[in-house]
Design a protein with these regions (language model features):
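P-loop/Walker-type NTP enzyme "switch/lid" segment
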Residues: 6-21, 28-101, 105, 109
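Short amphipathic alpha-helical segment that frequently serves as the phosphate-/nucleotide-binding helix
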Residues: 24-29, 136-139, 171-174
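Structural beta-sheet core signal
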Residues: 44-45, 101, 123, 158-160
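Short beta->alpha connector loops
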Residues: 104-107, 127-128, 164-166
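Inter-motif core of Ras-like GTPase G domains
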Residues: 110-129
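Conserved C-terminal guanine-recognition region of P-loop GTPase G domains, centered on the G4
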Residues: 135-151
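Beta-strand-loop-alpha "switch" segments that mediate conformational coupling across diverse proteins
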Residues: 162-167, 174-205
Length: 208
């Protein structure tokens, strides 16, 4: 995302009902990449996953990025979803700021209604049917929310993740998603390269 593209405040959700597809890793990578394009203090990562993956990593690696830990669990769902919603509303009046929300796995309808209020949803998934099937169901639920409220946002971007090097055939994914209003982003290759990029500092987060 180029600097001149971040004039208006943006809320980006990283979401999928399926666990283990790389939501926290993608949130970390996105925050670090944006920190090279815009002032890091203009970036807030809201970690709603009880595992605290994004919180623990970014607090140590990029303390200049704002991190808020608001776990969305059955015990705290109503309160913390309301707090996340408040953050997003406040962010709308802060031009040049970006909020990244790392969401947990699960099927909370209230959470997905909140996700639908964002500017963009990044949806990581592997190419396996075990991940593509629930991913398609999640996209279908987002389509329904957008249709119900006649909304053009959020933009849905599917992020092929954990892709082996040399893998070039994405026809299975394209076929599964052809009837949905989504964009398929560039593949994120095997995370061994990511760990190398972080000079060994990144632990085994791929199942977070």
């Amino acid at each position: 995302m180029a600097t001149n593209k971040v004039k208006n405040a943006k809320s980006i959700f990283v979401a999928n009902v399926k666990g283990g597809v790389g939501k926290s890793t993608l949130s970390i990578m996105l925050a670090r990449a944006l920190a090279e394009k815009i002032p890091p203090q203009n970036i807030t990562v809201i970690d709603t996953d009880l595992q605290r993956t994004a919180t623990e990593f970014l607090t140590n690696s990029n303390p200049e990025i704002n991190v808020e830990f608001l776990p969305i669990t059955p015990a705290f769902e109503n309160t913390n979803i309301s707090l996340v919603q408040q953050f997003i509303k406040q962010n709308e009046f802060r031009p040049g700021h970006v909020v990244i929300v790392d969401t947990p796995a699960g099927s909370s309808q209230r959470l997905w209604n909140l996700v639908a209020e964002g500017y963009c949803v990044l949806i990581p998934t592997t190419l396996s049917n075990a991940d593509l099937y629930p991913t398609e169901n999640f996209i279908r639920s987002m389509d329904k929310v957008k249709a119900r409220y006649a909304k053009s946002h959020p933009h849905l971007v599917v992020c092929p993740n954990k892709i082996p090097f040399g893998q070039k055939d994405f026809s299975l994914m394209a076929e599964r998603l052809k009837n949905h209003d989504v964009v398929i982003g560039p593949p994120l290759r095997d995370l061994a390269s990511v760990r190398h990029f972080y000079n060994g500092k990144m632990e085994n987060w791929e199942n977070k």
